[in-house]
């Protein structure tokens, strides 16, 4: 993979693929919890095959020490997917994605509490402007409890909260890293999501038609399995700031897909809100941790 594609090309490809996931999720007729479970299963199978082909091994001793954190982070990853998929149901793909990209702001807010890091003026400005961006994409006229649009944004922010939890827990997991850690988190997500799905909606694969199967396999194998391989292979080779900049191809792609493929509209105010969220979260990442 490394010989065929440059690290920059791998990351750009991964971000472009990540940005199209909403298009496929919309056409899979199962619950969000069930879809998250299948995504984890298919991705784990794909990564397991990748490890076999590349002859990579994961140290069992390191797994034992990190097991509680891996279970917690894997569970958070699973529920992060569930809430993001729910967000796609209630609002546009672009607004759901922009809400989801509030995750770095949540991490910035919690790091001082967990790691005794100080928030400087720059971090406070980024928090304030990103929050303003969320208010703008919500729309003042939609701030009512019965609004489907607002419900979608809340699901997106909930997904951002769980994703921020995964990021923060990863800082405590030191024995295993990168794609190996993600593979173990997929397994942990499966362990958490199986009882959740059985206790809620149950298994409903009989509802999935031919197109649904194509979309499901695409989300699990391509958007998660293959694309995670590209993503982590690229991260090992690229400088942190370049990776941070290129990662914003994901939400930009999602917005373009939402508007030009799905025909979903964005008002000028929502566009300004999206620019505030993405612009200030990117600024917060640049010049930070390397």
Predicted regions and their residues:
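Membrane-interface interhelical linkers
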Residues: 1-13, 45-72, 118-124, 142-151, ...
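Transmembrane alpha-helical core positions of polytopic small-molecule transporters
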Residues: 14-19, 43, 73-81, 103-104, ...
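Hydrophobic/aromatic residues within transmembrane alpha-helices
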Residues: 28, 35, 39, 87, ...
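Specific alpha-helical transmembrane segments that line the substrate/conduction pathway
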Residues: 34, 41-45, 85-116, 159, ...
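Hydrophobic transmembrane alpha-helices of multi-pass small-molecule transport proteins
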Residues: 47, 51, 71, 119-141, ...
């Amino acid at each position: 993979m490394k010989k065929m594609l440059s690290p920059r090309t791998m990351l750009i490809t991964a971000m472009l693929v990540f940005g199209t996931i909403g298009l496929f999720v919309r056409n899979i007729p199962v619950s969000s919890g069930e879809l998250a479970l299948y995504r984890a299963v298919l991705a784990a199978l794909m990564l397991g095959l990748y490890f076999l082909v590349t002859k990579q091994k994961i140290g069992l001793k390191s797994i034992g020490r990190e097991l509680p954190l891996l279970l917690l982070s894997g569970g958070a990853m699973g529920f992060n997917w569930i809430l993001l998929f729910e967000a796609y149901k209630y609002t546009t793909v672009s607004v759901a994605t922009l809400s989801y990209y509030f995750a770095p702001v949540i991490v910035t807010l919690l790091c001082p509490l967990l790691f005794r890091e100080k928030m400087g003026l720059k971090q406070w400005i980024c928090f304030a402007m990103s929050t303003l961006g969320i208010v703008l994409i919500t729309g003042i006229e939609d701030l009512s409890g019965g609004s489907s649009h607002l419900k979608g944004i809340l699901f997106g922010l909930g997904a951002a909260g769980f994703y921020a939890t995964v990021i923060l827990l990863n800082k405590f997991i030191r024995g295993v890293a990168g794609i190996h850690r993600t593979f173990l988190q997929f397994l942990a997500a499966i362990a958490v999501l199986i009882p959740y799905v059985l206790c809620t909606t149950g298994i409903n694969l009989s509802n999935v038609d031919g197109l649904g199967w194509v979309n499901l396999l695409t989300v699990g194998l391509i958007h998660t399995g293959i694309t995670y391989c590209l993503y982590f292979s690229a991260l090992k080779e690229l400088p942190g700031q370049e990776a941070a900049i290129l990662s914003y191809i994901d939400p930009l792609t999602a917005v373009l897909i939402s508007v030009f493929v799905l025909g979903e509209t964005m008002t000028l105010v929502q566009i300004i809100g999206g620019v505030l969220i993405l612009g200030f979260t990117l600024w917060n990442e640049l010049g930070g941790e390397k």
